């Protein structure tokens, strides 16, 4: 970006909707460690609806591998810039920032994030209310309408969950600014990592 090397990580919504599988988590851990070893700032174009769920995910140890990937992200000393393109839900969706040095988070207006997407989450969270209603479909629509009013990305931006909601057309120039800003932070030397789960 603007002549500076960076490590670019992006989600693939065509593979499991962008959800993190055990294999994805292992790739993320290795990628982040490699970028950190070579002092490359990380740019993450995030579209992650969370960890993959189900019997196969359980058998493959998705959560165990996910904790290791998130530990790698959190331990990273290299600067980090995330752009939430679309989805950032659940624990895996929250894995878009490091725990240390310089970290900037942008979101497109299309970005949606939180602990659980409304689609599918409403039935789980409001099952008793929906079942007790005379008209379950109407109750479901009422709950969806109420929650959709709270879903705006501007609410999260106002509480500083992200730094700025940006026009997608400005993304490259913002990322170039990021690369130039963090260039002086590149320091040669050994990266030490703590133990991971």
Language-model region placement:
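Ligand-binding clefts of soluble mixed alpha/beta catalytic domains
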Residues: 1-197
């Amino acid at each position: 970006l603007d002549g500076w090397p960076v490590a670019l990580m992006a989600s693939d919504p065509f593979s499991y909707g962008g959800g993190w599988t055990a294999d994805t988590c292992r790739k993320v851990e290795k990628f982040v460690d490699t970028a950190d070893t070579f002092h490359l700032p990380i740019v993450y174009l995030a579209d992650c609806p969370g960890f993959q769920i189900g019997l196969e995910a359980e058998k493959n140890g998705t959560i165990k591998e996910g904790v290791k990937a998130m530990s790698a992200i959190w331990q990273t000393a290299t600067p980090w810039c995330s752009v939430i393109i679309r989805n950032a839900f659940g624990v895996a969706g929250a894995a878009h920032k490091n725990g240390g040095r310089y970290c900037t988070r942008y979101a497109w207006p299309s970005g949606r994030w939180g602990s659980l997407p409304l689609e599918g989450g409403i039935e789980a969270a409001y099952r008793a209310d929906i079942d007790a209603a005379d008209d379950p479909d109407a109750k479901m629509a009422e709950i969806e309408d109420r929650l959709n009013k709270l879903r705006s990305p501007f609410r999260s931006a106002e509480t500083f969950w992200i730094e700025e909601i940006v026009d997608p057309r400005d993304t490259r120039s913002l990322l170039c600014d990021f690369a130039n800003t963090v260039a002086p932070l590149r320091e040669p030397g050994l990266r030490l990592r703590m133990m991971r789960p």
